[in-house]
Amino acid sequence: MAPCGRVRSRCPGPALLLLLALAARPALAGPPAAALQAGPGLNAAGQPAQGAAPGAAGPRGARGGGGGSGGGWKLSEEAVCREDVVRLCSKHSWANNLAVLECLQDVREPDNEISSDCNHLLWNYKLNLTTDPKFESVAREVCKSTIAEIKECADEPVGKGFLVSCLVDHRGNITEYQCHQYITKMTAIIFSDYRLICGFMDDCKADINLLKCGSIRPGEKDAHSQGEVVACLEKGLVKEAEENDPRVQVSDQCKKAILRVAELSSDDFHLDRHLYFACRDDRERFCENTQAGEGRVYKCLFNHKFEESMSEKCRDALTTRQKLIAQDYKVSYSLAKSCKSDLKKYRCNVENLPRSREARLSYLLMCLESAVHRGRQVSSECQGEMLDYRRMLMEDFSLSPEIILSCRGEIEHHCSGLHRKGRTLHCLMKVVRGEKGNVGLNCQQALQTLIQETDPGADYRIDRALNEACESVIQTACKHIRSGDPMILSCLMEHLYTEKMVEDCEHRLLELQYFISRDWKLDVVLYRKCQGDASRLCHTHGWNETSELMPPGAVFSCLYRHAYRTEEQGRRLSRECRAEVQRILHQRAMDVKLDPALQDKCMIDLGKWCSEKTETGQELECLQDHLDDLVSDCRDIVGNLTELESEDIQIEALLMRACEPIIQTFCHEVADNQIDSGDLMECLIQNKHQKEMNEKCAIGVTHFQLVQMKDFRFSYKFKMACKEDVLKLCPNIKKKVDVVICLSTTVRNDTLQDAKEHRVSLKCRKQLRVEELEMTEDIRLEPELYEACKSDIKNYCQNVPYGNAQIIECLKEIKKQLSTRCHQKVFKLQETEMMDPELDYTLMRVCKQMIKRFCPEADSKNMLQCLKQNKNSEVMDPKCKQMITKRQITQNTDYRLNPVLRKACKADIPKFCQNILNRAKDDTELEGQVISCLKLKYADQRLSPDCEDQIRVIIQESALDYRLDPQLQMHCSEEISSLCAEEAAAQEQTGQVEECLKVNLLKIKTEMCKKEVLNMLKESKADIFVDPVLHTACALDIKHHCAAIPPGRGRQMSCLMEALEDKRVRLQPECKKRLNDRIEMWSYAAKVAPAEGFSDLAMQVMTSPSKNYILSVITVGICVLFLIGLMCGRITKRVTRELKDR
């Protein structure tokens, strides 16, 4: 090159060279012979040049050269180099000095060392080539048209030797083939030694000494291989950025010189001498067919950098060059060339920015990505280059000085030894996610910045670790999506936790999504569909701009707040944006770490309550379970998310996946609606116990129901239907169960009082009914009952499933064994269910078809009454009949559990059974005492007609099934077990047990049991219908002899007794036998149980076999008394009239 003084006067330092961008690898053939044959210290004619440096002519005896064609001086004929040339260079190149020079300076060291004298000769030859003005004439001849086009070079003074320097400086703009070849060869010569680079020595002398990059004088190192010094300075520049150590700082002038040298060598890897020597073998191994020039060899080597067979020294050299590219994009020839017009078009290199900032690769990528995301057109060549370098940054963390600077501790502690193919970055991501320890805020910010720079959300292939881990999943689950499409990531998220997902892909995907979820711009599809809405509603700025008022993480929160607004609330999202917001919400529901706000506010609570919940989706469920225990900020976030889920349960992606079969079968209509509004969850709840329902779905639906109980806002439809009623009638009540109780109590009171206008609105009453029915299915949905009975459930119903109200049914069946508090709650529940049988989940489930058959139009409150009336129908389902009997048994334990009886006997109960009521407790059964009392009064025929009708039915039913008589069952349990075990074990009860007890009356020892059996006998006298065995035996006789006599009040029984005494009447043998048995029983009963009143006495007389004799005696007695009265007159003293009239 020309003397540096002239060049630096035009443009200080190596800044003169800023315009170079492109070059092609030189051909082996050199420029015109005159230039190529000139030797050190010689002119073009081969004569010694004036002013040649001492020793320029080379060693003694080598002057005047000859031996070349045309008699020109040849390097190959110099004695000091002849042996090296013959040994190292092919014979056809000996005649060409530049070819020999290229051969010798590309020698593999230290395998084939060149002699010291030859090295010195080469140095002087190269120095002359770069400083001798006589070479200018060759350049003017070869580059005539190029010089005319480049004004700066045309203006250089003639004969001063500055022209070659100028042409090297503008090599990228040279299009003339021969000129380009000549100048490229000159550049290769210059770049072989830093001292030959114009200005480099002056700019970097102090830095070379500071960084100890080697001697600046020829000596220990070969004079022509001083490219190692430049490599050392490059490493110093890189180290400065990575360590931020004030003791190791490269001066600004030298920094510019280093980057300019790297830029000038960007087109041909031969020009980076250190990299060339380090990677020659690897070039042959990996890039043998790659033509040199335009940075192609560099790119090829970059692509193979992490191959196992890549040498370590080459990998280090490539990494250093990549780090320089990261500091100045112009060090990449292909990137600078492909993106030149786009950078200018989108003002990515405006003058007012600091040079160090706009030159950074990250700034270029961010600026051009911003244009792409705004929908601007960036050339495909430039986008291709951007993709390559984004992939490069993701592949090797060491190319990002911020990562090394901020994450050094995390790398050493958690990620050592994972330097290849992006594994270190993913390891750091894993640490940030909290899976391998804690991470500093600076490291997290550096990672977030790198993810924004590389933008892997736009193309998954940028993340090599993810690409390799997920290749099989993409080929199977996402093969319908074009390779590189941003929707690939969404597709992978949709298949997260499915059988198609592989574990390694799952980890890499979640690690990347953690960062994408923290900056809405990194989700390309979301940004594309929502940038208008975000600008309008959330006041966001450009893609690569940030705002303190609206940080990236807050934008999505703003969007989803608007996504679920009603039309009345206004300012809603566009349909496309809303769909994307829902997609993101679905993804976030899979992992709590994908929701930045949730993880930030709930970090302490997650550690406190959910440290053991590591399975998919368990952390959010755990937070919901402990909602009342969470700190305020976390509780608000979880509450808002749960409220959102109640409106659109499809956000719960894992639940939706588990429930897919049931949705397709039973809920496809509501699932297809774009606006959910809680319909889908309601449908799932209603079909929770279908046989198609799988366990995962049922558990998920039940869990959501349990969460809903914590706050009525979590039931979207209930909230929307009743929020005004709640504010008016139930203020300050939060829990759903309390709101339901408050509203249902209000509705019941208004109904009982026949209020003209209900205080609870019609739409709320309808939804309230839905909520009440849903709560009956699982005891956990009734928190007060569940809390009261927890210990009893553990003791008695431990293996019983919660669903289908099975626990509630279990508690009902063992009611007598329950703790007092639980017993009371169960009694209250039964009282409610008997008043409104539709709330009896088990009854409604078991008898669903029978209700459709027998009670399609029955009011819900009369449902059980209707079923009881049809219980003995031939087409009644046995299971339903059994369930009706169970409810009848329950009703007969206490009149309060039989609303119809309670209403019919409203006046009779306090009149006849007050003493029992006085002993009664509100929450404890009377064990049938009131009903037994009413039965006795029924026998005395003293009840009101309505009450009598109800008691008759109860007597008839209990006569067929002893279990319907709680007093009998309680007092005669031992007798039934010992005397009537076979009858009690019968599947169908038809009065056999009662008959057995009557027959064995004499064997009964227990007084209370005997009394109950005697009461049965007494009841049977009142009406034959209450004695099923006798009624069955005498059915034909009643039809023949007593058809005209209406039933009731013992009339048909008296008719049969008269027929038995009438000799003219022949009764059926069975009937006659049963009647005689009854008479004997009644006779014994009369002896054992004396009449308690006149009515009992009269009944005993009427049913006695000596009825006529007794009546005759009574009549005679009365007549005798009458006659005595007539004959004996007054017994009292007579009184005079005067005394009477006083």
Curated annotation (Swiss-Prot):
Stretches assigned to the Extracellular side: 30-1108
Region (Disordered): 45-69
Signal sequence annotation: 1-29
Protein's membrane topology: Single-pass type I membrane protein
Membrane-spanning segments: 1109-1129
Sugar-modified residues: 128, 173, 544, 640, 749
Keyword Repeat appears in the UniProt entry: yes
Biological role stated in the UniProt entry: Binds fibroblast growth factor and E-selectin (cell-adhesion lectin on endothelial cells mediating the binding of neutrophils). Binds fibroblast growth factor (FGF). May be involved in intracellular FGF trafficking and the regulation of cellular responses to FGFS.
Protein name (Swiss-Prot/TrEMBL): Golgi apparatus protein 1
Organism: Gallus gallus (Chicken)
